[in-house]
Amino acid sequence: MTLRRIDPAPPVVTGGRAERRRAARRAAHARRDSPGVIVSRVTGELFITLGVVMLLFVAYQLWWTNVIAQRQAGGAANNLRHSWEQGGGPDRDAGEFSPGQGFAIVYIPKLDVKAPIAQGIGKQKVLDRGMVGHYADGALATAMPWDKQGNFALAGHRNTHGEPFRYVNRLQPGDKIVVETKNTFYTYEMTSRLDQTPPANVRVIDPVPAGSGFTRPGRYITLTTCTPEFTSTYRLIVWGKMVDERPRSKGKPDALVN
């Protein structure tokens, strides 16, 4: 039997990288969120995302639809005037225009409004494209400006999609509304306004419109739009009477020059 030297075991070193990793995992496990905290965090993130989506939608409705519609309406007005310059001929009856077809331009100088007028009041083909629509279908059909008597009734958006009738509530008696057609400028003078009426009250666009103060046939204009703003609960109505008829060959009427 021989003797041999037994070296002592090397000392255990603590605090190394592996130990630190294990300690970190233990700490993370100890801090693990409860199910309630996780649900609250996820719900909060969903609400934030929903809020961003809603803000984008509002921006689209209030701003971008106006940009697109005003661009479309401007192009339609330019194309309409160009077509007038290319050919003559008399004005046509309402039934000879197809739905969505432009045939006139309306100006409201006090409000700095210039918008093409198209046949019909359809949202997609007319109103949402920034145009003003002429009541021309079925029981709601109304006169044309060149008719010797009748009520030329128009509809337009008050908010979004070009909003050509946004500020018609600011019109006062005596303010001018001008309609330009292929051959003629028709100038109307605002006479009265109905601030609120149900959408079902179609008598406001009668040949002698109810509530306007007119009592006998004449050459009238009616503007209709939604009210209050950003809703379609009621209708706001503006009436006027024709005070001047001027051939385009003689130049613009005073209302568009002064």
Residues of each region from the PLM?
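Solvent-exposed, non-transmembrane regions of membrane-associated and secreted proteins
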Residues: 35-36, 41-172, 176, 180-258
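Terminal targeting segments of Actinobacterial cell-envelope proteins
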Residues: 1-40
